[in-house]
Amino acid sequence: SEKTGCTILGKAEFLNPGGSVKDRTALGIIRAAQASGELQPGGRIVEGTAGNTGIGLTLLANAMGYTSTVVMPLTQSKEKIDTLELLGADLRLVGATSYSDPNHYTHTAEKLAKKFAQREEHGAIWARQFDNLANMDIHCRTTGEEIWAQTEGKVDGFICAAGTGGTIAGVSVALKEHNPGIAIGLADPAGAALYEYVRSGELTPSEGSSIMEGIGINHITDNFAHAQVDVAFRISDEEALPYIFDLLKHEGLCLG
């Protein structure tokens, strides 16, 4: 990096079949539910998602003999809605509300999963990606270990944003087991509360808002509770977007 003088490495999770890091989360959740017996052959997987986890779950459901129901805010991008419809998900679009609202997409998914479990022959599960520790576990066992191996242990820091907190929790645990001195950084968008939580322990949303979808939360998920974060950065859209387009124009990388 000419700007920083550092070597900056990116992990190309967009090369996963569903196009994002959430394919790992989806696989981890399904495998854990299979192992526990909660997910029966031919069963239904229900999840509330901003899109990417729903895409991963639907692809895996198709390949593994399950069906998927995806609950998503209708404010999410048309591209994600179109993709889920193309993949054959049972897509339920709901209004965008705060997490405290009983009609929030996550709570709607939970209620739907209970209904399906009662009436469908092969049952149903709620994936509950925010608080299901199978999320962070697969990132600890795969994503974090891959970063350590692929850098040959020559990594000083890792930084990512948090939606469910599964990636940053799992990767931070894995890397710090190898080297406790590795710095873990959180990039938090405007309007989210984790930046202030890391700095002061207060769960206070920052000023402003962001166009980023599925990133930035105002409560501590069970996954994020395990994240070993050393430093947090508040990133505005005005700061992030020029870098996104610079990477596209000069590096040939479309990152969002």
What are these regions (language model features)?
Residues 1-256:
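PLP-dependent amino-acid enzyme catalytic core
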